[in-house]
Amino acid sequence: GIAGFDHIDFLEEPAAAALHYHASSESRHSTLVLDVGGGTTDIAHAQIGGRGEEPVIHRAWGLPNGGTDVDLALSMAHFMPLFGKGDSRIPMHHFVDAAMVQDMPRQREFHKRGFADVEAPYRERLLSLQRDGGTTRLYRGVEGMKIELSAHGKSQHALEYIDPALSVQASRDDLVTASESFLGRLTTLLQEVRDALPAAPDSLFLTGGMSRAPYVQ
């Protein structure tokens, strides 16, 4: 067996969450599991709970979108203008390449791009962003700002590793605007789920980091 196991089953995330919820539910009931993660959103309609009974996954739905879509929108709207987006002749896709740290081909494209012909101050800022760890630090700043704006009305993030005097400011309204595209897709999916269900579920089980965001709830 693999690593000492004779048999291994892989479960999709909402099915795994349904099994977890099933283990803690004494009475039999229907539930809708909504798993809003970083890169994907998954929904499962299940019958769970009850002593000695097995959970039943009736149907599942999904989106190839999640929290990273909000990160990208926030980065493009508030971080990348400091690197020349919208105010230079640099093609837009270079800023997307820099922002998407989860996409290694895009990261390679950004790091091999020459910016010697870009006007100041963007040339120096982009070259600093290309240094080891630059795009990762920027992404962590974007993600941190998203989390802070979920709890507070305003946020400021210093970009001292790019320029000692450089910083980004954003408001809760800016975060709501950055989430609009993702929330639109999520709303459409939820309507599809609602139309497909024979009756309203007895409970709703939220899981995944993005499910805790107030603008998602």
Predicted regions and their residues:
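Conserved phosphate/pyrophosphate-binding and hydrolysis machinery centered on Walker-type P-loop NTPases
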Residues: 128-135, 168, 172, 210
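N-terminal phosphate-binding loop and flanking beta/alpha elements of the actin-like ATPase fold
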Residues: 1-33, 47-63, 173-216
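Short beta-strand scaffold segments in enzyme catalytic cores
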Residues: 42-46
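A contiguous, well-structured pocket-lining segment that forms one wall/lid of small-molecule binding clefts
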Residues: 151-181, 188
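Phosphate-binding glycine-rich/basic clefts of nucleotide- and phosphate-handling proteins
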Residues: 47-161
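Short glycine-/polar-rich loops that comprise or flank the Walker A/P-loop
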Residues: 29, 41, 70
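Short, glycine/acidic-enriched loop or turn micro-motifs at the edges of active sites
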Residues: 16, 38-39
